[in-house]
């Protein structure tokens, strides 16, 4: 039954709950929040609920400024960051799930072990085989090639919105990791492009992308992983 609400400042936050130690099925808890005494973002509401209503609620958070990517979750059907998502003024009920199609540790906390193992696989660091005694310099033009790529904060919103990643997360690297891979392919200081492309070759790691483009639509940083993936495909097909 939907709670009745005659107060525009009163919102009901409906949160997915599951605890591994409890054999019961997952459930929802509903928490009233007055926006007049709460911060403007969903993360503010979650912190207030944890502090004042239910200390057992589990979720990740850190910077509160859209930089760390910790508070990624599904809010009213969209993968986004709780710290950047305003509390809706035109909705009585806001529903929050963890990132979809991922194993859950507790409540809104997904298990990102596989995600970060894939990140490690692409060798996300500068590889330059030309010895140098000073720093590796980069022109402003070359640096500008990284705009729209390096800003990725590994929140996993895009990967968790990708149907190909849902069904092939053990093989397909997913949009977030492939965007990170392209970040190093596009870096003029890196000399390891050939080996990096070898890591991404084959049918499963890269070519499971079917350009559905959920990744680009959901990215809270307004990046375009789909474009980066297309660039990698072009490099492999025409190298």
UniProtKB/Swiss-Prot annotation:
Residues reported to bind [3Fe-4S] cluster: 162, 209, 215
Organism of this sequence: Porphyra purpurea (Red seaweed)
Chief site of localization: mitochondrion
Positions that bind [2Fe-2S] cluster: 63, 68, 71, 83
Name listed for the protein in its UniProt record: Succinate dehydrogenase [ubiquinone] iron-sulfur subunit
Species classification: Eukaryota, Rhodophyta, Bangiophyceae, Bangiales, Bangiaceae
UniProt entry keywords in alphabetical sequence: 2Fe-2S, 3Fe-4S, 4Fe-4S, Electron transport, Iron, Iron-sulfur, Membrane, Metal-binding, Mitochondrion, Mitochondrion inner membrane, Oxidoreductase, Transport, Tricarboxylic acid cycle
Membrane topology designation: Peripheral membrane protein
GO MF annotations in UniProt: 2 iron, 2 sulfur cluster binding; 3 iron, 4 sulfur cluster binding; 4 iron, 4 sulfur cluster binding; electron transfer activity; metal ion binding; succinate dehydrogenase (quinone) activity
One Pfam family cited in the UniProt record for this chain: Fer4_17
Keyword Acetylation attributed: no
Gene: SDH2
Role summary: Iron-sulfur protein (IP) subunit of succinate dehydrogenase (SDH) that is involved in complex II of the mitochondrial electron transport chain and is responsible for transferring electrons from succinate to ubiquinone (coenzyme Q).
Swiss-Prot/TrEMBL catalytic activity: a quinone + succinate = fumarate + a quinol
Subcellular location: Mitochondrion inner membrane
Cofactor binding summary note: Binds 1 [2Fe-2S] cluster. Binds 1 [3Fe-4S] cluster.
């Amino acid at each position: 039954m939907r709670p009745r609400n005659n107060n525009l400042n009163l919102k009901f936050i409906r949160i997915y709950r599951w605890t591994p130690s409890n054999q019961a099925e997952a459930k929802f808890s509903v928490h009233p929040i007055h926006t007049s005494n709460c911060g403007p973002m969903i993360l503010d509401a979650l912190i207030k609920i944890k502090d004042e209503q239910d200390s057992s609620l589990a979720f990740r958070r850190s910077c509160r400024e859209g930089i760390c990517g910790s508070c990624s979750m599904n809010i009213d059907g969209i993968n986004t960051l709780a710290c950047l998502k305003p509390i809706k003024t035109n909705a009585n009920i806001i529903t929050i799930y963890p990132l979809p199609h991922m194993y859950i540790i507790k409540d809104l906390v997904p298990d990102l072990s596989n995600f970060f193992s894939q990140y490690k696989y692409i060798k996300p660091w500068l590889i330059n085989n030309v010895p140098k005694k000073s720093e590796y310099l980069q022109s402003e033009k070359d640096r500008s090639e990284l705009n729209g790529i390096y800003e990725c904060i590994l929140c996993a919103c895009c990967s968790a919105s990708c149907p190909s990643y849902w069904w092939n997360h053990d093989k397909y690297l997913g949009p977030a990791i492939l965007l990170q891979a392209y970040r190093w392919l596009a870096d003029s200081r890196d000399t390891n492009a050939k080996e990096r492309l070898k890591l991404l070759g084959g049918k499963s790691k890269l070519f499971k992308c079917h350009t559905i483009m959920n990744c680009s639509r959901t990215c809270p940083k307004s990046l375009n992983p789909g474009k980066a993936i297309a660039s990698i495909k072009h490099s492999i097909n025409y190298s």
